[in-house]
Amino acid sequence: MSDNAPVTPPIFDGHNDILSLLYDAGLSMDAPVDIDRFITGMPGHLDADKMRKGGFAGGFFAIWVPSPIDMDVKTTQMNLPVYDLPLPSEIAPDQAVPVALAQAAILHRMEQAGYLKICTSTAMLQSCLDNGKIAAIMHIEGAEPIDRDFYHLDMFRRAGLRSIGPVWSRPNRFGHGV
């Protein structure tokens, strides 16, 4: 590489959905992560190969609990000349926690396989950036998995959670909005 070649800054992603995509692909806490799918098989999104080629240094890996929806009804409504879709209903923690735990487990399996490091401090993040290791900040998008007494928050924090977006496109006990 010549001294005049442009230096590409490391890419740090403010949000990615790889955990929910892997979860939706049928992965769970009881099933092993399909490492081959993560290495090269995530069309249109991140995978290990795309991360490496694109200079991906790390990012916020979102844990997200989807709303149950009837896509046929939604598609019909959205094809009308004018439509108004209400926000999805609140999801109770007992429904959200298993999905969130499964996605957190996927992130931990990715770390155990050596593809990234879950960062829980700025020192860990800086070390990853300095050493070329993908830095993962565990993020919850919508605080549905967090109970009123914050027991689940403590559990997720111990698992590596360092960022929460309190609401997504539905209300929960902490707020409402998009």
Model-based region annotation:
Residues 1-178:
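N-terminal hydrophobic targeting/anchoring segments and the immediately downstream early-domain regions
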